[in-house]
Amino acid sequence: MAETLEPSLVGEIDTSAPFESVREAATRFGGFGFWKPSSLNISEASQNEVGMVLKASELEKELIEKEGETLKVLKSLESTKAIVEELKSKIQNKEDKENCDMNVFKELNQAKMNLCKTTKDLAAIRVSVGLLNKRLEEERAALEKTRERLNSENAAEMSMEIQRLSYEAKEFSRTGENVRYAVNKAVAEIEQTRNKIEAAEMRLIAARKMKEAARAAEAVAIAEIKAVTRRGRRRRRGGNGEETMQEEILETIDETAREIRSSRRTLEEGLAKMEAEEGNWWWTEQRRRSSCSAKFKNPPYMMDVKGLNMMMNGDGTSSSVAVLKPTMSIGQILSRKLLLADESAMMMNGRVSLGQILGKTNFGDREKEKRFNGKRKRFGFANLSVMLNKESKKKNKKKKIALNLSC
């Protein structure tokens, strides 16, 4: 709009106030004067008044015209002010646009700097990524080599493990066969032991009966000894026959004492050998059981001679389910019940039982009995048949020994 109005303007526009007072307007449009009445020249005054009125009317017309011009000028001034304001706003907008352009330029420069920095960082990152990719490839190659090596080693180890397991399976099968054979052998030995124990029990019963018979015979012998002592006392009163009788009695006592000592030593040696053989047999049995139990994870359940379940402990000892008294060997039973008790009692009383007298044997006969009665010796009955065979031979000596002991 300002561009369209600029060519129509001819001169400058005075925007100041046109009139500050009436005096200035009068001075501008014809001057100013003072009125003086004159009595002398009234006509001239009237004429002057008419002329003044005319001039005033003209001046009013001019004033009206000037006011119209002034209004036009004011209107043009207002339009000019509007144009100036519009121009100022346009200038301000242009300045703002220039400032915006500067800001945008600065932002563009900053963005360029950031882009350069980012490109540098990106180049460094690309270099580091390349190094990492290279290292990753190297690690993958090493991993593949390691995997191949492990696969080859695992194959070799698996083959060795399979061979070892097959060998262990064969060993276990052999061990199972050996254990089966050992179990069968142990069952057979248990059956034999059971039969031997039954025979030993029968022999023990026979020995007890023999002991009772020996005690009865001992009582008879004591009665005979008492009778003989009475006769000896009667004969002492007679004279020389008494001295010979005493000498015979002393010789018989000495011989009997020597026989008792030898028989005791023989009996102790036989008992020691019997206990040693039983201990050896028991030790081998325990060792066999412990070796059989060590080959298996589960402890084997075994049966003793009475049919009770027995379990082998870790120390090689056996424990049965039913709590029993500690078992003793047959030799220990015989040595405690048949020999030791009677021997100690008779030695304290100064007497010897008939069973101890009958227990004396010769070494030659014992060697024969070893060949024929080897199994009996384990259970303490090696001398039983010898005692039965020699019982008749010693009846004569028995009377003499009993007589000497009673004296």
Swiss-Prot record:
Q: Does Coiled coil appear among the keywords?
A: yes
Tell me which family the UniProt entry assigns to this protein.
Answer: Belongs to the WEB family.
Report the protein name in the record.
WEB family protein At3g51720
Which residue spans adopt a coiled-coil conformation according to this UniProt entry? Answer: 72-99, 128-217, 247-278
User: What does the UniProt keyword field contain?
Assistant: Coiled coil
Sorted alphabetically, which InterPro entries does this protein's record hold?
A: Web
Key word Heme present: no
High-level lineage: Eukaryota, Viridiplantae, Streptophyta, Embryophyta, Tracheophyta
- Family matches, as Pfam families: WEMBL
